[in-house]
A protein has these predicted regions:
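Contiguous beta-strand/loop segments that form the cofactor/metal-binding neighborhood of enzyme cores
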Residues: 190-257, 271-279
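Short active-site oxyanion
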Residues: 38-41, 76-78, 128, 183
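Active-site loop of classical SDR/Rossmann-like NAD(P)-dependent oxidoreductases
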Residues: 22, 45, 238-241, 260-271, ...
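Beta-loop-alpha module in the N-terminal Rossmann-like domain of NAD(P)-dependent dehydrogenases
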Residues: 57-118
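Predominantly a Rossmann-like dinucleotide-binding segment in NAD(P)-dependent oxidoreductases
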Residues: 127, 134-206
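C-terminal helix-rich "cap/oligomerization" subdomain common to oxidoreductases
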Residues: 1-11, 66-69, 77-79, 223, ...
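A short helix->loop->beta-strand "cap" motif at the edges of active sites that frequently abuts
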Residues: 59, 97-99, 124-127, 225-226
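N-terminal Rossmann-like dinucleotide-binding module
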Residues: 1-58
Length: 306
């Protein structure tokens, strides 16, 4: 799989779609600082936001429908910092234009939307990565690989509770309409599932139930025979917030380490995209995996609401 630039020696030209907090705090800094990448431009729905972010990182701003096409023309790949159901059709558009894609999780909040992305990527033969933080942060990526190799796991527990909507929270991410509508299941659920599935195997049976506020509880049966429980939410009191992932099995217990922030992890995702472009070997956390995550989350949401 060759990049649109025609050579793997040249920097990979990656354009950024989106100008919100995630783009400002994580993606744009990571792309601009990456030695193997040229940040080829920033597109935003608001011209002033696109101009500000592009100026901060020494690149060009794009806006409007024609700006999307112009950014695709100037890029080998595009990264997305947009709500999932805005991201999905634009990812299809980028793939059909022959551009590699680096998506945020979840790929979409409907199965049809996620399937359209995976199908477009397959038909175009482009590289794809879905940015699930723990799969690309160096510390947790190495830990996941180690636990997969150890095997013999009996059960697991994952708890990802944020305080985004807790009283007194001042997080700018709380202003995201899609997060408020879909809650922790959709925002942090992909992170937990992206750790459990490679270690324990695919989910063969899923049970979901609602908890307080936006919290969702899952019980999963995996193809290895192991089971896992998951608690997800964005409304925990600040003193109760935190992330814990633990496996228990034949060799004892293993708990996930901490990691050095989202920007470092995103650089790892950029590296993974570049490697897939270079080798043509799909990454395990690609558009197909993103589609499967959406299928599981839709099933869980349906059960929890019922």
């Amino acid at each position: 799989m060759d990049s649109a630039a025609g050579t793997t020696a040249a920097p990979l030209r990656i354009g950024l779609l989106g100008t919100g907090p995630w783009a400002r705090n994580t993606q744009a800094p990571a792309l601009a600082a990456h030695p193997g990448v040229e940040l080829s431009g920033v597109w935003g729905r608001r011209a002033e936001a696109a101009d500000a972010l592009a100026t901060a990182h020494g690149t060009r701003a794009y806006t409007g429908e024609e700006g999307i096409d112009a950014l695709l023309e100037a890029s080998d790949a595009v990264a997305f910092a947009l709500p999932p159901d805005v991201q999905a059709p634009l990812a299809v558009r980028a793939a059909r234009a022959g551009r590699h894609i680096l998506m945020d999780k979840p790929v979409a909040t409907t199965v049809d939307g996620a399937r359209a992305v995976a199908d477009a990527v397959a038909e175009a033969g482009v590289a794809s990565i879905v940015f699930c933080t723990l799969r690309f942060a160096p510390e947790t990526a190495a830990w996941i690989a180690e636990q997969t190799a150890v095997g013999g796991w009996f059960t697991a527990r994952a708890q990802w509770l944020g305080s985004l909507y807790a009283e007194g929270s001042t997080s700018e991410y709380a202003d995201s309409p899609w997060r408020r509508e879909k809650g922790g299941l959709w925002d942090v659920g992909p992170h937990a599932l992206s750790v459990l599935i490679p270690v324990l195997g695919d989910v063969e049976h899923l049970t979901a139930a609602p908890g307080p506020a936006d919290t969702t509880h899952l019980i999963l049966r995996h193809s290895s025979g192991a089971s896992s429980t998951v608690a997800l939410g964005l409304s925990a009191p600040r003193g109760a917030a935190g992330v814990e992932i633990e496996f228990r099995g034949e060799h004892g217990t293993a708990s996930a380490p901490g990691w050095d922030g989202a920007e470092t992890a995103f650089r790892g995702a950029v590296d993974a995209l570049a490697e897939t472009v270079r080798t043509g070997v799909p990454h395990a956390c690609d558009a197909r995996f993103g589609r499967h995550l959406t299928e599981l989350l839709v099933a869980a949401e349906t059960q929890a609401r019922a």
